[in-house]
Structures are given as C-alpha cells and as structure tokens.
C-alpha cells in the first residue's frame, strides 16, 4: 500500500541561478515535495518512529535551498530528491 504526503509552499531564500545577479541578490524559492511512502505500520503502531518526520524533511529541504548555490534549478531539485 502506498500513501502520499504533500509538503507544499515551503518558502526559502537562496542564491541559485545561471545569472550573476541571481547568485548575488538571491531570491525566494517556493518548494513543493511529494513523498510516496507506506504508512501502514505507523497506522497500526501509533509510533512516530514508523512514519515520516515532516519537520526533518522541511529542515533537509531548507538546508539544501539555503545552502551552496546551483546554476540550474534541475540540479537543486536533484539534490533535494537525493537527500529525502
């Protein structure tokens, strides 16, 4: 069984882009993440260890977006996908 968790509208300030101004001035990035997971065990046990910690996912995405700059948004998205 698969469940889907949506974390939508996460806003972070980052310095990504191919243009010098994007890296110098930065901008707001709005990130949506969709996680496909099996939460069957969490539903049975009521134990937080059996689920996804939304706060940790948020912090992981925040650290990536607010971290070292990327020229391409595609590269930034790949870094997020690999981490979560």
From Swiss-Prot:
Q: Does the keyword Cell membrane apply?
A: no
Q: Which GO terms describe its biological process?
A: folic acid biosynthetic process; tetrahydrofolate biosynthetic process
| Organism field | Staphylococcus haemolyticus
Protein name in UniProt = Dihydroneopterin aldolase
Q: Where does the chain bind substrate?
A: 22, 54, 73-74
The family annotation for this protein states: Belongs to the DHNA family.
Catalytic activity of the protein: 7,8-dihydroneopterin = 6-hydroxymethyl-7,8-dihydropterin + glycolaldehyde; 7,8-dihydroneopterin = 7,8-dihydromonapterin
> What InterPro entries does the entry give?
Dihydroneopterin_aldolase (IPR006156), FolB_dom (IPR006157), GTP-CH-I_C/QueF (IPR043133)
């Amino acid at each position: 069984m698969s469940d889907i968790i949506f974390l939508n509208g996460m806003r972070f300030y980052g310095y990504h882009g191919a243009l010098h101004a994007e890296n110098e001035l930065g901008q707001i990035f709005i990130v949506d993440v969709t996680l496909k997971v099996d939460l069957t065990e969490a539903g049975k046990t009521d134990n937080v260890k059996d689920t996804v910690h939304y706060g940790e996912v948020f912090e992981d995405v925040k650290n990536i977006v607010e971290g070292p700059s990327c020229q391409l948004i595609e590269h930034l998205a790949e870094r997020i996908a690999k981490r979560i």
